[in-house]
């Protein structure tokens, strides 16, 4: 797969609004493929929780993929680390750019950066959309659960690597 070129930089506070819009767009445009309308609304609503979304982005090592030339945001990926273990907290691609390898490349760069800082293993809770990306990156499915989010139940998958 020929992954679109992108610039890669760390997220800063000024990015939160743009990333929330990308997150909301992904939920609203992709969510109906696998979720009920109520689940889609619940998923998208997190983008409106400014303090929560700000912590989601800035409380982890989040990086942004931008299109070269105009710096249009293409996606973002964040990981937190503790005691040598990394938890991938976010992996979102703008809907017009899904299925082009961008998510896999952002995940690869995120894991590589964390490994260079001493992280030896990774885990994540993922959705039906990102599960194939994580499996392709060498993660194994270890658990499937029904868990509440914004008042709705969602099926989520636990994946681990290393």
Predicted regions and their residues:
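Conserved active-site tyrosine of GNAT-family acetyltransferases
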Residues: 134-135, 139
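Conserved catalytic-core motifs of GNAT/GCN5-like acyltransferases
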Residues: 121-125, 140-158
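Conserved G/P- and acidic residue-centered "switch" motifs that form tight phosphate/ATP-binding loops
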Residues: 101
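Active-site beta-strand termini and strand-to-loop segments that position acidic
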Residues: 66-68, 159-162
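Acetyl-CoA-dependent GNAT
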Residues: 10-13, 21-96, 107-109, 113, ...
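Hydrophobic residues in beta-strands and at strand termini
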Residues: 93, 126, 159-161
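Conserved N-terminal entry element of GNAT/NAT acetyltransferase domains
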Residues: 1-17, 162
């Amino acid at each position: 797969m020929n992954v679109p070129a992108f610039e890669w930089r760390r997220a800063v506070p000024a990015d939160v609004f743009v990333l929330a819009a990308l997150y909301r767009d992904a939920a609203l445009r992709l969510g109906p493929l696998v979720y009920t309308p109520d689940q889609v609304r619940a998923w998208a609503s997190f983008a409106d929780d400014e303090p929560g979304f700000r912590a989601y982005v800035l409380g982890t090592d989040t990086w942004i993929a931008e299109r070269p030339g105009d710096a249009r945001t293409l996606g973002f990926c964040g990981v937190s680390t503790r005691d040598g273990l990394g938890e991938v907290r976010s992996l979102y691609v703008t809907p017009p750019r899904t299925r082009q390898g961008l998510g896999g490349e952002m995940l690869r760069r995120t894991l590589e950066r964390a490994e260079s800082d001493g992280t030896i293993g990774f885990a994540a809770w993922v959705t039906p959309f990102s599960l194939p990306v994580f499996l392709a990156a060498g993660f194994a499915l270890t658990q499937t659960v029904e868990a509440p989010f914004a008042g709705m139940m969602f099926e989520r998958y636990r994946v681990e690597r290393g």
